[in-house]
Structure formats: C-alpha cells, structure tokens
Amino acid sequence: MPILEKVPPKMPVQASSCEEVLDLPKLPVPPLQQTLATYLQCMQHLVPEEQFRKSQAIVKRFGAPGGLGETLQEKLLERQEKTANWVSEYWLNDMYLNNRLALPVNSSPAVIFARQHFQDTNDQLRFAASLISGVLSYKALLDSQSIPTDWAKGQLSGQPLCMKQYYRLFSSYRLPGHTQDTLVAQKSSIMPEPEHVIVACCNQFFVLDVVINFRRLSEGDLFTQLRKIVKMASNEDERLPPIGLLTSDGRSEWAKARTVLLKDSTNRDSLDMIERCICLVCLDGPGTGDLSDTHRALQLLHGGGCSLNGANRWYDKSLQFVVGRDGTCGVVCEHSPFDGIVLVQCTEHLLKHMMTGNKKLVRVDSVSELPAPRRLRWKCSPETQGHLASSAEKLQRIVKNLDFIVYKFDNYGKTFIKKQKCSPDGFIQVALQLAYYRLYQRLVPTYESASIRRFQEGRVDNIRSATPEALAFVQAMTDHKAAVLASEKLQLLQRAIQAQTEYTVMAITGMAIDNHLLALRELARDLCKEPPEMFMDETYLMSNRFILSTSQVPTTMEMFCCYGPVVPNGYGACYNPHAEAITFCISSFHGCKETSSVEFAEAVGASLVDMRDLCSSRQPADSKPPTAKERARGPSQAKQS
C-alpha cells in the first residue's frame, strides 16, 4: 500500500485560502434601474402587449424614487457589505434546497464516460479500483490545497476563478428536509476526515475502508476488497431491502421516511456511514442491453428504475461513480454543492489518472489479511416497507416519463463557427432559439448558465438567450412570404449573436438580472407583510419558468453531460461543441403532448445546417455547401447516438 503522510484535519478557513491568495472581488450589486430596464427588455417580446403594459406600470411603481425597490436595494447593499456573496444563500435555497422534486432527472445531472469493454467482472472491478485510486489522489491534492487555480476561458478570459466549489466535491451531503433540504459539509476539526467509500452492489451498501493504519490501499488491495463485496452481495440469503430507493423519492417524502429510519440505532449507524463517506461507487448490473449513448445516459440519469439499477444509488451524496458490468460508466452528481464545470474538471483528472497510472506513490507490501468490507444493515418497519413501495412506483414513473436523446450533429463544429468570427456558444444558442421557434412559432424564457466564479463564492447567473435580436432573426428565417434577402438574414444573425455575447459578458461580470431580482424578492419576504406586486405579476412568474434550460459543458476527453427539463412542458438542452461536431443531449417529458425530444433535436440539426448555409453564402470558401441529404436529415437519419 502507498504510505500516506498523516495530515491533521483541515480547519474550514483553510479551504478558503485560495480566495485569500487570489484576493477575488465581491460580487457587485447592479444598479436598480438598469436591472428593471433589462428585465422589461427581456420580456417585452415574449408576452402579449396588454400584459406587458400592465407589467411596465408595476415595474415603474416598484422602481419609483423613494419606493419599495429603492428600499430593498439599500438593504441589498448593506447585505453586500456584511457577506462574502450577497446572493449565494438565496440562490442555493431557490435553485436546489427548497425544491421538493425527486433528484433523479429533475435535479441531478450525469456525466457519461466512453463505453468500456469489460470482458468479465474482474475487468469491471479493476476499472472501479483504478477509479477509486484516482479519487484518493485527487482528494489528497484538495486536502493539501495543491489543486491549481482555474482561469477564465472564452469571454473576458485570463481572470482567476473562485475554487471553493472543489472543496465540496468529497465533503458534501444533501440532507432531506420536510420543507427545505440542508447542504451539510464535513468541516469539523474534531471528527476525523472520512476514510471510507460506500460501494453499492445489488442494491446493497458496503463500507470500503480506503485507509488502514494510516496507509492508503493500493489498486490491488482495492480490487481484492471489491471482489469480496461482489461475493457478499451475491449471497441472496443476506440481502436486505433496497433502501437506496428512498433517496430517489420527492425530498419531503424521503425526509419523512428518513425520520422513521432514524428511530432504530442500526439504521442510524448505517446512515451515518453513508453521510460521511468520501463518495459512492455503484457496481451496476447490466442495463437494457442497448449500449448507445442515449441508453447509457439513461442508466446514469435514473438507473432504469427499480428493476434494473435505479435502487443501486444514494442520490443525496454529491458524487456517485457508476461502473456497470456492461461497460456503462460515469458519474451522477448531486448538483447543489458545485457546478458542472467543476465536476468535469474533477472527472477528467480521474480519467487521466486511470489512463496514465500514478507511478509516484511508494508501494509497500499489502497487509497479510485486509479486514473484510462491512455490509450496512437496515431494520425495516412496516412503515418503511410502505415508503419503499411508494418510492419504487414513483421512480418507475420518472423512468417512463423521460423523453431523452443524445444527438451528435456532425456536419460541422466550432472550427467552422470560429471561421465566421462568431462565438461558438452564441451561435449554438441562436440555433436553439431558431429550432424552438420553428416548432412552436414563439420564443420562451430561456436559461443558460453563466459562471460568476470571478467573484468570491460565485456560482452562476442566467444568460437570457431569447433576446429581441434572436426573435428578429428567427422570424426572418421562417417567414417565407417576406422574401428576406440572405444578406439581411446574415446581418440579423450577426446581431443576434452579438446580443447573446453582450448579455454573456453582462452575466459573467455580475450585471445580469436574475440573481439581483431573486435577492430583492427574498429581502422583501422579511420586510413586507404581503409579497410585492412586482414578484406576483404574471410576467415575472413567467420569466422564471424556463421552458428552455440550456448549458454548454465542454470536455477535452470522450464524455458528455446531460440532465432533465426544469418544467413539465420544457426541454433540457446540454451541448458539448467539438472541433468538427456538436453533441446535444435533449430531454423533455412524455407527459407533455406538446414536446418531443426527437423533433426538437431534428429542428436543432436543421437550424444549424441552415445557419451554415447562410454563412457559406457569404464565404463559400470556408465550408463546402451542404448536400440535400445533409439539409434534410435529422437525428433519426443522422447520428442518433
């Protein structure tokens, strides 16, 4: 086993030393009148004229001199002085902890690795052992504060970014609550650092100690222990109920079930071991047999339900690494502690570790007999059995309701877009708007996450991609009666991309509207007896129903990210631009008759082809003209991965 230096537990303040060294600025508070004007500009073209006039009057009263808006703005400026980040608590509660929906599909994204080709169970376990070894190496970097600082890329590149999210990767747990969850972090200087991983196998949970006598287990030792776990899990006489199913339920239902579990000391001990672990490793059985990108992603998003691997999970833990017998591998993320880019950075580090091997560690002979991993025990009352049956039924509903496709658009990628002197992200966002307009003849409030990690404790704000300029472009592209010239369409496209880019810069510099309005709304809860009309207005409520929830999650290795929609009639659209292709993960719900993930993916493909055709009409040398087959094909005929 590699010999570890015994390091004293970290105090919470040490996790913030990166920010102290970087001296990151505080998140600014945007001017009130600027935010109100931008809000109206973002919504005017998305609502009926009469509704907009009513909202305009409400906003005017809210922002009037000496009015409620100015009072709340003053309170917010006071809050900015007293806190590291004035929106972080409000944002975390609103985005995650207050949400009562089940975590699978609704909240927890997944990263899917390249398919592995395991010949047998031993291959599967070797991969898992190597992955755990990589986790321990990465955690050692975090514990010693040795992880290099991230620097901004893309718009306004070259600025250092807040690193606090990295220190939550292996130390966070989302505790269910009856009305609000709690994000728990292991910050104690008294309790020892966790030195165990929880392994899920056959819906059973096992404690795998990864440090014994101050020595970290080698990959060989980890492999040996994993083989023991698989053997123990295969003993049907010892099998216990699939308690992990409870974590897939609605948050209030799981909180109630957990309260019942806690009445028994055996259950309390088992819950404590899970809640304090470094991470979960889920050794899955085979899935549906379909190993396409789409079906492997579904195994990560919901496990295929209780009949497959859906109960072989513990959704409250921030990182669950899935290693399936059929080669389906990836990670399921409880999203509240950190953002997608942090997850990707961690995951890419692990995969590189697995590819290269860590030769720097000093190897010593394994102890003669490693203590056997421990199965977590559960005492299930009739009430708990009822909770399990209900959870299983609801998970099956989630599985059946998800309409999901991985679509690889391979006609071109970001190389072509950059040749047009366009932002790839802005270009793709406009394509998404065009796709939606083609299907529904309207634009809708759109969410695109924008990192605000340039500031202390920064997470994200929203880029509102459904701009007036995007509407002008998509109308020109779809109005066949108007006979708009190609040169005019091209000019409208450039304006739409420019508007998207300008809003992006506004968001990443802390000047977007969503976090600001959220903070004003939350401050009003404490200050006002009744909710202000500003935040009860239909236009404001509509502005927060994101029918298009989008995110660019680029990777340098073969993997992709996916998630579900955030409203019943919406789409999730996660995309990964490559040099010569773009991978899209499109999600919606079968329960909504208006939506179809395949149709939306086809519309995205057609929009991208038409936009290339439009650009190529000006610069034919930059790209070969699309063939008739390319123009017509969608994901059903092209690469539906």
Swiss-Prot record:
Its EC number is 2.3.1.6. One of its GO terms (biological process) is muscle organ development. It catalyses: choline + acetyl-CoA = acetylcholine + CoA. InterPro entries: Carn_acyl_trans (IPR000542), CAT-like_dom_sf (IPR023213), Cho/carn_acyl_trans (IPR039551), Cho/carn_acyl_trans_2 (IPR042231). PROSITE patterns: ACYLTRANSF_C_1 (PS00439), ACYLTRANSF_C_2 (PS00440). One of its GO terms (cellular component) is neuronal cell body. The modification Phosphoserine is found at S17, S366. It holds the Pfam family Carn_acyltransf. GO terms for molecular function: choline O-acetyltransferase activity. The keyword Acyltransferase applies. Keywords: Acyltransferase, Neurotransmitter biosynthesis, Phosphoprotein, Transferase. The active site is at H335. CoA binds at residues 413-425, 451, 552. Residues 615-641 are annotated as: Disordered. Catalyzes the reversible synthesis of acetylcholine (ACh) from acetyl CoA and choline at cholinergic synapses. Belongs to the carnitine/choline acetyltransferase family. This is Choline O-acetyltransferase. It comes from Mus musculus (Mouse). The gene is Chat.
